[in-house]
């Protein structure tokens, strides 16, 4: 949906302007969400080419060629608007990626539902790796700077992006935040996206990898319900493993569902609270960062 309607304005901590303001000295020049809002409203007619009634009574609004329904917009118009928005975002993402590669910054985009334990995972990681890896963080939420404050309590540098009515970060926002945060060369940058398993899947931020965090309290079928996110990710972290003795949750079934969506997906089971399984994540982090550094040097 965000790829066709756009999202609300955003604010980066310490700034009074809106992201995309031409007055900012950032290397990104155009406002990200300045796409055409001519929604081709119909004159009372009601098209049915974008949804399907299944035999079980459910209604599917993903059966049109655009894969999504927007009132008053034809499927062809939806596709065009989506292309316009994503092409702008991809250009900003490519610029971010080039910057990260020049600086040797290893950027990860953490995505999940609200309450999966992303922030707790980052806090634990920063504390445990403080003598092994320099880490800075970009936090994304609709409102408050609570998560950035939690990160700063670890001693790490963090900046908060508030997206307002927007439900995901985009590459333009991240580019501004990176300019202000200025991650150290050779460091890791953790980008904690807005809690949402839908919209962030389509938006490349320039990261090396998307990491999807799934709490064991969410259900084994979550990868099948929200396939785009799991298809876009390189690593799935099953968090809150300390709760498994108290839940009717089949870890193997959940992983199998995720691999049905994305056969190349790597998976880890951890508890950010107790530390169980975290060393495996740290090993993945260090190996992935080293591989990325080698590829950057070769390129």
From Swiss-Prot:
Compositionally biased residues, Basic and acidic residues: 31-57
Positions that bind Zn(2+): 167-168, 199
Disruption of the gene: reported phenotype: Insertion mutant lacks any hydrogenase activity in symbiosis with peas, but is still able to synthesize the polypeptide for the hydrogenase large subunit.
Pfam families, per database record: cobW
GO biological process: protein maturation
Region of interest: G-domain: 107-268
Gene Ontology terms, MF aspect: GTP binding; GTPase activity; nickel cation binding; zinc ion binding
Annotated Ni(2+) 1 binding sites: 2, 5, 7
InterPro entries cross-referenced by the UniProt entry: CobW/HypB/UreG_nucleotide-bd, Hyd_mat_HypB, P-loop_NTPase
Domain of life: Bacteria
Residues holding Ni(2+) 2: 167-168, 199
Keyword Zinc-finger: no
Alphabetized UniProt keyword annotations: GTP-binding, Hydrolase, Metal-binding, Nickel, Nucleotide-binding, Zinc
Region of interest called Disordered, as start-end residue ranges on this chain: 18-57
Protein family membership: Belongs to the SIMIBI class G3E GTPase family. HypB/HupM subfamily.
Domain remark text: A histidine-rich region at the N-terminus is proposed to play a role in nickel binding, both in solution and in chelated form.
Role noted for this protein: Involved in the maturation of [NiFe] hydrogenases. Required for nickel insertion into the metal center of the hydrogenase. Exhibits a low intrinsic GTPase activity, which is essential for nickel insertion. Is able to bind 4 nickel ions per subunit. Can also bind zinc.
Name of this protein: Hydrogenase maturation factor HypB
Gene that encodes the chain: hypB
């Amino acid at each position: 949906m965000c790829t066709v309607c756009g999202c609300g304005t955003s604010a980066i901590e310490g700034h009074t302007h809106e992201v995309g303001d031409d007055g900012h000295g950032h290397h990104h020049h155009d406002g990200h969400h300045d796409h055409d809002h001519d929604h081709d409203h119909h004159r009372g007619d009601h098209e049915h080419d974008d949804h399907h009634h299944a035999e079980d009574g459910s209604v599917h609004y993903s059966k049109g060629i655009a894969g999504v329904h927007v009132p008053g917009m034809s499927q062809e118009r939806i596709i065009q608007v989506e292309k316009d928005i994503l092409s702008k975002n991809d250009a900003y993402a490519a610029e971010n990626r080039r910057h990260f590669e020049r600086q040797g910054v290893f950027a990860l985009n953490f995505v999940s539902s609200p309450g999966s334990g992303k922030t707790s995972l980052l806090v634990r990681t920063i504390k445990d790796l403080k003598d092994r890896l320099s880490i800075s963080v970009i936090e994304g939420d609709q409102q408050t700077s609570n998560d950035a404050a939690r990160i700063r309590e670890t001693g790490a540098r963090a900046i908060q992006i508030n997206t307002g009515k927007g439900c995901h970060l985009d590459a333009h926002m991240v580019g501004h935040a990176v300019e202000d945060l200025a991650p150290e060369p050779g460091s890791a940058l953790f980008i904690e996206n807005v809690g949402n398993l839908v919209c962030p899947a389509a938006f490349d931020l320039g990261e090396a990898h998307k990491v999807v965090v799934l709490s064991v309290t969410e259900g084994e079928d979550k990868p099948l319900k929200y396939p785009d996110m799991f298809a876009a990710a390189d690593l799935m972290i099953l968090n809150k493993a300390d709760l498994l003795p108290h839940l009717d949750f089949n870890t193997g079934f959940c992983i199998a569902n995720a691999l049905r969506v994305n056969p190349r997906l790597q998976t880890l089971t951890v508890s950010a609270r107790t530390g169980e399984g975290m060393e495996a994540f740290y090993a993945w982090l260090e190996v992935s960062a080293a591989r990325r550094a080698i590829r950057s040097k070769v390129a």
